[in-house]
Amino acid sequence: MESAVSTSTQVPDEFDRNVPRICGVCGDKATGFHFNAMTCEGCKGFFRRSMKRKASFTCPFNGSCTITKDNRRHCQACRLKRCLDIGMMKEFILTDEEVQRKKELIQRRKDEEAHREAQKPRLSDEQRNIIDTLVDAHHKTYDDSYSDFSRFRPPVREGPVTRSASRAASLHSLSDASSDSFSHSPESGDRKMNLSNLLMMYQEQGLSSSPDSKEEDGSSLSMLPHLADLVSYSIQKVIGFAKMIPGFRELTAEDQIALLKSSAIEVIMLRSNQSFSLEDMSWSCGGPEFKYCVNDVTKAGHTLELLEPLVKFQVGLKKLNLHEEEHVLLMAICLLSPDRPGVQDHVRVEALQDKVSEVLQAYIRAHHPGGRLLYAKMIQKLADLRSLNEEHSKQYRSLSFQPEHSMQLTPLVLEVFGGQVT
């Protein structure tokens, strides 16, 4: 009985691709190189048996039979002669002992591979479900076509150049990794809705649409109306995302609001990394009209004290090359921080955050062999976000104290950022 162990000769891929897969003995479909020649399984077995038995065949005709797939059994002498003519060599045939050793080697490799596979870190069903839920929540609350941006008050890039704007171009030379970003998640919202109403809406109905924003005349901060609408819209989407985090709805309304008020700008900054480009240090949200550079943000009242670390953060986060699963888990961890001002049930919030953190660590172990530092780098990004949040709050307060500017902000922005405690 023929051995099931292959004794085929391995040949380079380039040669394999250029050689027709036809048996050189009988013209049947070849299965590879066997004993130094391209043959079918039938002729491979015939040659092995003939050599092992040291068979001696005699042609009943004139010794020049044409061997084909249909007649290859009619003349063994000419078939064997054809095998030798195309280069098949008995030296390539394994002895019974060699065949047994090869079988054992193949089995040992299979066992080792099975053991490695069994030892590989795996996610539990519960952890996989948490990831799937968060990815789905992100997809439902982040429209990467940015189609709703046209509903905001239009961007106006003309106007007086501020000191920050004149220095903003220098940020385009940044290429190293470090701290944070500016906000611009997907979709628009009712500027008359407050945070409590939005929480109730998402609690009862889930995701909702968002009406058009009114166009108003701008002030010297020409981009403020547009970016105020963008941030208001992004806050609504963060609320929608938060409501789908496993366990978030079970928190008290007070704790939900406290978490959202304190973390909204940080989650927006995290989400905005999806549209951030390392090539020109800008956020591209669709067409040219909705491509934002640092100079645009200075025209909404922010200074380089926020924007420089913001861009460094975006660069650093982008260079981590996070999987989408890691990105959404990081957003959930950010949102579920028990040390936020106003949170009452710290233990419950911390338990939710710990569970998501464990999922992130398990995912990294399963998908980044040797990437032990990745989790620490991601958590450092959350620390960077705290600093950015603090600077954003300081600059927001300065802006909101000026009536001509605060009137450009939406009620939701005023509520979320107006009551922050730092």
UniProtKB/Swiss-Prot annotation:
Gene Ontology terms: biological process: cell differentiation; embryonic cranial skeleton morphogenesis; heart jogging; heart looping; inner ear receptor cell development; intracellular receptor signaling pathway; negative regulation of transcription by RNA polymerase II; otic vesicle development
Entry-linked PROSITE patterns: NR_LBD, NUCLEAR_REC_DBD_1, NUCLEAR_REC_DBD_2
Annotated region (Interaction with coactivator LXXLL motif), positions in chain: 243-261
Stretches annotated zinc finger (NR C4-type): 23-43, 59-78
Annotated region of DNA binding: 20-95
GO CC terms of this entry: cytoplasm; nucleus
Region entry Disordered, spans: 106-128, 145-190
Intervals of motif 9aaTAD: 411-419
All residue ranges annotated as the NR LBD domain in the record: 126-418
Binding-site residues for Zn(2+) 2, renumbered to this chain: 59, 65, 75, 78
Subcellular location per the Swiss-Prot or TrEMBL entry: Nucleus; Cytoplasm
InterPro entries (UniProt xref): DBD_VDR (IPR042153), NHR-like_dom_sf (IPR035500), Nucl_hrmn_rcpt_lig-bd (IPR000536), Nuclear_hormone_rcpt_NR1 (IPR050234), Nuclear_hrmn_rcpt (IPR001723), VitD_rcpt (IPR000324), Znf_hrmn_rcpt (IPR001628), Znf_NHR/GATA (IPR013088)
Compositionally biased spans, kind Low complexity: 163-185
Main location: nucleus
SMART domains: HOLI (SM00430), ZnF_C4 (SM00399)
Entry binding sites for Zn(2+) 1: 23, 26, 40, 43
Keyword Nucleus assigned: yes
Function summary: Nuclear receptor for calcitriol, the active form of vitamin D3 which mediates the action of this vitamin on cells. Enters the nucleus upon vitamin D3 binding where it forms heterodimers with the retinoid X receptor/RXR. The VDR-RXR heterodimers bind to specific response elements on DNA and activate the transcription of vitamin D3-responsive target genes. Recruited to promoters via its interaction with BAZ1B/WSTF which mediates the interaction with acetylated histones, an essential step for VDR-promoter association. Plays a central role in calcium homeostasis.
Family that this chain belongs to: Belongs to the nuclear hormone receptor family.
Quaternary structure and interacting proteins, as annotated: Homodimer in the absence of bound vitamin D3. Heterodimer with RXRA after vitamin D3 binding. Interacts with ncoa1 and possibly other coactivators, leading to a strong increase of transcription of target genes.
Comment on protein domains: Composed of three domains: a modulating N-terminal domain, a DNA-binding domain and a C-terminal ligand-binding domain. The 9aaTAD motif is a transactivation domain present in a large number of yeast and animal transcription factors.
Full protein name: Vitamin D3 receptor B
Taxonomic source organism: Danio rerio (Zebrafish)
The organism's taxonomic lineage, starting at the top: Eukaryota, Metazoa, Chordata, Craniata, Vertebrata
